């Protein structure tokens, strides 16, 4: 393990050479740019869906009382489904998790732990995951809230884990700390299926959505 990463918290590890790092937002923007090459594709941002109904076609009611008609509808709201479909909402639990980004940690401090620019994720039920980005900044994620209430100090909450795993790095102030929702299911398997012949859904990736949502999207398409 020492040739890749070193920490007093971990005694052994498995190295997977088939995996890599990804910037989630850039990946999302890249997908959007590819979709927009198709002139029949339209992306609506900041457009809340109020309701929908299905007969021969699907009618989607969005904000400002605007209706959109479509042959098919795929519901992929995940943890943010709200009251759009209460049956689907009951199949998932929105759970909050947290990430901190550090831009002020000197390279010599990071070199104490990172031998190579790898991504690390542990096997805890509420796992810790962290990596160095392309600018050698530390991105550290972990923690969970099942109550939908954030800790009073998000950064301090994450630093408790950093102190155990990367001792000494917790003294540096985070550039930014944020929270977001993931949707978990009881059995931790994604919840995918159809409601009618022309309405489909996919949700509940239990923290693995970035890896498999593109595959699920192709399946539904």
Say what each PLM segment does.
Residues 1:
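Dinucleotide-binding Rossmann-like beta1-alpha1 core, especially the glycine-rich loop
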Residues 9-14, 194-201:
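Glycine/charged-rich beta-loop-alpha catalytic/anionic-binding loops adjacent to active sites
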Residues 12-71:
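Helical element adjacent to the flavin cofactor pocket in flavoenzyme catalytic cores
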Residues 49-54, 67-197:
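Active-site substrate-recognition segment that forms the wall
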Residues 161, 214-221:
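Internal hydrophobic alpha-helix adjacent to the cofactor/substrate pocket in enzyme cavities
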Residues 201-208:
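Hydrophobic alpha-helical bundle architecture
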């Amino acid at each position: 393990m020492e040739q890749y990463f070193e920490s007093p918290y971990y005694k052994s590890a498995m190295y997977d050479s088939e995996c890599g790092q990804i910037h989630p937002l850039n990946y999302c923007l890249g997908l959007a740019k590819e979709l927009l090459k198709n002139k029949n594709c339209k992306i609506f941002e900041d457009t809340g869906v109020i309701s929908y109904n299905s007969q021969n076609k699907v009618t989607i009611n969005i904000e400002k009382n605007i209706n959109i008609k479509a042959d098919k509808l795929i519901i992929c709201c995940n943890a943010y489904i709200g009251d759009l479909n209460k049956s689907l909402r009951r199949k998932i639990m929105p759970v909050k998790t947290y990430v901190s980004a550090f831009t002020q940690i000197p390279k010599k401090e990071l070199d104490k732990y990172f031998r190579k620019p790898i991504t690390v994720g542990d096997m805890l039920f509420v796992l810790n995951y962290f990596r160095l980005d392309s600018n050698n900044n530390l991105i550290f994620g972990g923690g969970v809230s099942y109550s939908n209430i954030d800790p009073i100090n998000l950064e301090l909450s994450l630093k408790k884990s950093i102190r155990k795993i990367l001792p000494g790095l917790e003294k540096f102030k985070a550039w930014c700390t944020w929270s977001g929702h993931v949707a978990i299911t009881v059995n931790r398997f994604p919840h995918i299926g159809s409601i009618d012949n022309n309405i489909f859904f996919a949700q509940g990736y239990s923290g693995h959505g970035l890896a498999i949502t593109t595959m699920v999207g192709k399946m539904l398409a």
